[in-house]
């Protein structure tokens, strides 16, 4: 039953974010903000597919242990694409609120992203085994969490300052995604049931993507 539910949920998620992302790109009408948002959604869905597709196959066939290599490789790829996702989201923020300068913030985004990717590439992560050490899960997620926190603060402040109702909950979607993700990193191997938190985490990312799509539709409708 769990295998069927997870598989159907993952299919729904991937189809949703990829289709919405493609629509954003195709219907952006040259808007850099919405083009970035579209590519952000495509990167999210494409990256997650490397992990979710093998997971669905594993759950519906011989089990997760039999797909250790594929699942580990998928997590490895996803860890990098999620970093790219937040870099793109940072540039959505710059485009939407017409941000000029602020080189220190940009350098912070690049530094945290680079640190995250470098840590993800370390062999100590043991991605391709069933025994990825918790310590390295924490190390590689520290710069990722700081990157997420930075983006949360940027969107919270800017949406409030500009009275941006379309993006007023963007910061919350990121808070929720990390709030559901961190317990899985810390206790997923010890308390397997915490893995279920990845479902609401995924829903938070769908909300993120839909915020961008709804904003595009509303702005173009208003222009017409």
Language-model regions: role of each:
Residues 16-26, 87-93, 118-123, 142-168, ...:
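Alpha-helical transmembrane segments in multipass membrane proteins, preferentially the mid-helix core
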Residues 171-217:
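Terminal transmembrane helical module of multi-pass membrane proteins
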Residues 39-57, 114-116, 172-185:
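Hydrophobic alpha-helical transmembrane segments of multi-pass membrane proteins
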Residues 3-5, 63-75, 129-142, 191-201:
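Non-cytosolic membrane-interface motifs at loop->transmembrane helix junctions
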Residues 21-27, 50-67, 72-106, 120-122, ...:
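Internal transmembrane alpha-helix with an interfacial aromatic "cap," most often the third helix
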Residues 26-37, 93-105, 130-133, 156-168, ...:
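Membrane-interface helix-boundary motifs at transmembrane edges
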Residues 1-19:
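Hydrophobic transmembrane alpha-helical segments in integral membrane proteins
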Residues 111-138, 155-159:
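Membrane-helix boundary elements
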